């Protein structure tokens, strides 16, 4: 006879497993590029057609400007913005778009002009590219707390009610940033740790004080420093700079965060900061495109439109299986937009609008098509389709197949730099003016 108590336990366990998986994959988009940091959504009903008036659940203005992407947990949507010199943390309601709270965390200026003085002095402080400002790092949440980071190094943790739990400044604590085009790396949350990366000009070729690139972890609840690891590379000057966010990789026996920048791809233990492996000599200059993973292979672009390289990782250890890259591809590679992988294929978009599809295993190019416009937003993979959004707010959707097929072109009518977020079959896009939720309106 079946034990009813045991049956209840088994049923409860099954429900918990299903619920946990559903909440994590379909409801929440907790960080930049989503739950796995790879811009892949499990949604089956994400819209493919919309306009500035059609198939829009809501559209709300966002004060100021920013390049950060929204993060989502349940009915909470978080974003950052810079309004003049005010650095703002914002919370919106997912179903209505209502701005639930706005917190001025600090003030700062996105300096555009280099420092004048002796040769090399302009490298001793950061300046910002005209396309972005201090609100470039995206927020991250674990469902209880949310972390905001700004380009001047201001780091703050709040609860969902908007109470600030702790604040600190990376430049004040760790030294002045020497990043050529403005700090933009997004933070991560791993267990009870907030992990930040700073990759910057070492100033090694100049006389005087030097600068370090580093990873640093803080307790999520208290802001207490837990570990700090210097990230050493052989890069020089601007080549040291990297604006990328690490990506998680969970091998059978090892969880690691993988970073591209400083002409180097490497991995670290997120619990301790220990470096696990590195690949040097990936020369290409300063790096904006972050790595992505598809089927135990890391794909990364070597700096400014450098080769796209594929590094195979062992399924158990997570270590590279070979000294050299499995393959590399050099034509029309991206300078800003991250690769995205799905179903054994890799998709990239160059800054000037060449969309391409490659075989993830051997680098075979299946198609290379110019789809129009200039791009900074990273593409999204969802339900057998790839979403490419250009600076003018035109989203071109293509089939994620070996044959180039355009599904739709959608016009938002506002400029877009930020990468999209997905939750409950709705697409959230942050434009230069607004936050837009694309999909069927929610019922009251």
Task: Give the location of each predicted region.
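Bacterial N-terminal signal peptides that target proteins for export
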Residues: 1-10
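Bacterial N-terminal signal peptides
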Residues: 9-19
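Ala/Thr-enriched low-complexity intrinsically disordered regions
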Residues: 4, 19-22
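Noncatalytic, solvent-exposed loop/strand surfaces
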Residues: 21-444
């Amino acid at each position: 006879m079946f034990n009813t108590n045991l049956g209840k336990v088994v049923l409860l366990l099954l429900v918990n497993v299903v619920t946990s998986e559903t909440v994590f994959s379909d409801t929440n988009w907790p960080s930049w590029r989503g739950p796995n940091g790879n811009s892949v959504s499990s949604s089956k009903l994400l819209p493919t057609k919309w306009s500035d008036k059609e198939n829009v659940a809501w559209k709300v203005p966002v004060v100021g400007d920013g390049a950060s992407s929204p993060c989502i947990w349940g009915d909470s949507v978080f974003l950052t913005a810079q309004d003049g010199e005010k650095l703002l943390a914002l919370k919106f309601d997912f179903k209505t778009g209502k701005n639930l709270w706005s917190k001025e965390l600090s003030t700062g200026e996105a300096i555009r002009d280099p420092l004048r003085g002796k040769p090399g002095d302009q490298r001793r402080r950061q300046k910002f590219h005209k396309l972005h400002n201090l609100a470039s790092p995206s927020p991250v949440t674990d469902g209880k707390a949310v972390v905001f980071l700004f380009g001047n190094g201001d780091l703050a943790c709040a609860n969902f009610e908007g109470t600030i739990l702790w604040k600190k400044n990376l430049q004040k604590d760790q030294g002045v940033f020497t990043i050529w085009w403005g700090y933009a790396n997004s933070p991560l949350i791993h267990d009870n740790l907030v992990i930040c990366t700073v990759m910057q000009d070492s100033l090694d070729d100049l006389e005087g004080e030097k600068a370090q690139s580093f990873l640093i972890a803080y307790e999520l609840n208290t802001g207490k420093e837990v570990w700090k690891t210097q990230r050493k590379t052989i890069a020089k000057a601007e080549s040291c700079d990297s604006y990328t966010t690490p990506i998680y990789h969970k091998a059978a026996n090892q969880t690691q965060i993988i970073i591209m920048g400083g002409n180097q791809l490497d991995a670290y233990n997120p619990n301790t900061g220990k470096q696990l492996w590195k690949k040097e000599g990936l020369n290409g200059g300063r790096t904006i495109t972050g790595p992505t993973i598809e089927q135990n292979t890391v794909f990364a672009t070597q700096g400014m439109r450098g080769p796209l390289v594929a590094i195979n990782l062992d399924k158990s250890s997570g270590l590279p299986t070979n000294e050299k890259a499995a393959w590399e591809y050099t034509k029309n590679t991206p300078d800003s937009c991250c690769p995205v992988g799905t179903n054994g294929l890799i998709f990239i978009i160059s800054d000037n609008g060449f969309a391409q599809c490659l075989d993830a295993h051997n680098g075979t190019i299946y198609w290379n098509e110019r789809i129009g416009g200039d791009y900074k937003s990273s593409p999204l993979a969802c339900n057998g389709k790839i979403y490419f959004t250009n600076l003018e707010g035109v989203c071109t959707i293509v089939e994620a197949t070996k044959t180039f097929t355009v599904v739709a072109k959608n016009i938002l009518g506002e400029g877009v730099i930020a990468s999209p977020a997905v939750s409950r079959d709705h697409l959230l896009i942050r434009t230069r003016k607004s936050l837009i939720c694309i999909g069927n309106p929610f019922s009251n």
